[in-house]
Amino acid sequence: MRYIKSMTQQKLSFLLALYIGLFMNCAVFYRRFGSYAQEFTIWKGLSAVVELGATVLVTFFLLRLLSLFGRRVWRVLATLVVLFSAGASYYMTFLNVVIGYGIIASVMTTDIDLSKEVVGLHFVLWLIAVSVLPLIFIWSNHCRYTLLRQLRTPGQRFRSAAVVVLAGVMVWAPIRLLDIQQKKVERATGIDLPSYGGVVANSYLPSNWLSALGLYAWAQVDESSDNNSLINPARKFTYVAPKDGDDTYVVFIIGETTRWDHMGIFGYERNTTPKLAQEKNLAAFRGYSCDTATKLSLRCMFVREGGADNNPQRTLKEQNVFAVLKQLGFSSDLYAMQSEMWFYSNTMADNISYREQIGAEPRNRGKTVDDMLLIDEMQNSLAQNPEGKHLIILHTKGSHFNYTQRYPRSYAQWKPECIGVDSGCTKAQMINSYDNSVTYVDHFITSVFDQLRDKKAIVFYAADHGESINEREHLHGTPRNMAPPEQFRVPMLVWMSDKYLASPQHAQMFAHLKQQAEIKVPRRHVELYDTIMGCLGYTSPNGGINQNNNWCHIPDVQKVAAK
């Protein structure tokens, strides 16, 4: 006991790091390394060693940094690190839970009764048993030589700072090396995998809950800032809800780089959309994006027309339609194969999971990270919201370059393909790979429909921008005032389930949509806000919905004819 009391704060931090990093993560080690052992390679063995070391060193790095606040504050913060890590380890060990944004958001909910429901006697016993030893160490130790004190003491500054910096470098450098190695494997095989460092950070304590907590805090600050700075249509306008909307499911699929002129349903010579072509409840429009890059389009495609400035950076002025639906009583989940966190937080979604978190899920370890992983997330979301009035946002990777990485080998029907980034592909090879990716998009979209056929549901799809695939220009992102037309060509789809169409009003809306699609009426991103609200049956007596932009608005002449 005397040794524990007299131990330096640096030694105590390392001892705690061993306990948290190794003991509390042992269930994760077992699951991750168990799969490594089945097909062992030198790189997998090296990965195991790196991950073991990283969990210890990152915890040591954290605890030493926290001692910059002084001895008393360090004890409190270290106690919280131990307790939070012990609590998280219970769910990771016994329930195989991946601690991410959604878990943290659920824990931080203001509904304390709901949070209590997941805390039982076994959890309390585990928390006490796992935490008691490190807490005794923390509160018995004199905490001599905190980093704050050492930095203030001549002769100790360089050495103490060097140890902390070295720990950080020893975490970052090996993981970075393995990340580079994984990228080489991806380029050689055409298989797309999540960031190695991102998966590691989302898999182990304490980095998983710390990163999720940081993301949650940032989202709250960002949301609060946006609430104060952005115009809120839900407050500015009056929205009248439809009488039969409380059991409705809404899904919005955000596509990536897919062009309508490479889709069979729009007359393209190749049958790239065989499944969508069979959908009787689908209205498909030739659309035009508001910009040519993902980040810019996400700013302007979900707000009211004029809700984003027309400047190069597309400065936001208003909240988006998803935030408005949330304020109108919808629950919402967002699942993404990308990492546009600024946008995700602006949706006010109850739960957000992005590609690294999804890739870290036990059921997804070792799998290619493609859009179909979102289907499992969607199924869970539907199961957890059986009553409806629920919004699901799916942000896909769609047809983004490298096109060949966007689909499995079974979808490689047009060859030769563009295999690698540096392989100097011909235009024909790039088009073959691009068209294969569009066929996989077709499969993904109809898989979303399959989850909703027995529900009262409406699905919207719109790609964020188009793509250039020719000898002179490639990819996208050209400034919109000089971008070629193909970078603006995006498919925009509306699908309604049979139960949704059982309503005469909805059936009339859909008939109007089909009529407009058949005569090839062009549609725009900036019409999505009014269309989503209008197709759900919302009305606004004071201008909250621009009927000129509402695809589901039936002109008075047609209403009279219908009667």
UniProtKB/Swiss-Prot annotation:
Residues 1-9, 70-79, 139-159 are cytoplasmic. One of its GO terms (cellular component) is plasma membrane. It is a multi-pass membrane protein. It is found in: Cell inner membrane. It catalyses: alpha-Kdo-(2->4)-alpha-Kdo-(2->6)-lipid A (E. coli) + a 1,2-diacyl-sn-glycero-3-phosphoethanolamine = 7-O-[2-aminoethoxy(hydroxy)phosphoryl]-alpha-Kdo-(2->4)-alpha-Kdo-(2->6)-lipid A + a 1,2-diacyl-sn-glycerol; alpha-Kdo-(2->4)-alpha-Kdo-(2->6)-lipid IVA (E. coli) + a 1,2-diacyl-sn-glycero-3-phosphoethanolamine = 7-O-[2-aminoethoxy(hydroxy)phosphoryl]-alpha-Kdo-(2->4)-alpha-Kdo-(2->6)-lipid IVA (E. coli) + a 1,2-diacyl-sn-glycerol. Its main location: membrane. Residues 31-48, 101-117, 181-563 are periplasmic. GO terms for molecular function: phosphatidylethanolamine:Kdo2-lipid A phosphoethanolamine transferase activity. The keyword Oxidoreductase does not apply. InterPro entries: Alkaline_phosphatase_core_sf (IPR017850), EptA-like_N (IPR012549), PEA_transferase (IPR040423), Sulfatase_N (IPR000917). The keyword Protein transport does not apply. Coiled coil: none annotated. Its EC number is 2.7.8.42. Keywords: Cell inner membrane, Cell membrane, Lipid A biosynthesis, Lipid biosynthesis, Lipid metabolism, Lipopolysaccharide biosynthesis, Membrane, Transferase, Transmembrane, Transmembrane helix. GO terms for biological process: lipid A biosynthetic process; lipopolysaccharide core region biosynthetic process. Belongs to the phosphoethanolamine transferase family. EptB subfamily. Catalyzes the addition of a phosphoethanolamine (pEtN) moiety to the outer 3-deoxy-D-manno-octulosonic acid (Kdo) residue of a Kdo(2)-lipid A. Phosphatidylethanolamines with one unsaturated acyl group function as pEtN donors and the reaction releases diacylglycerol. This is Kdo(2)-lipid A phosphoethanolamine 7''-transferase. It comes from Salmonella typhimurium (strain LT2 / SGSC1412 / ATCC 700720). The gene is eptB.
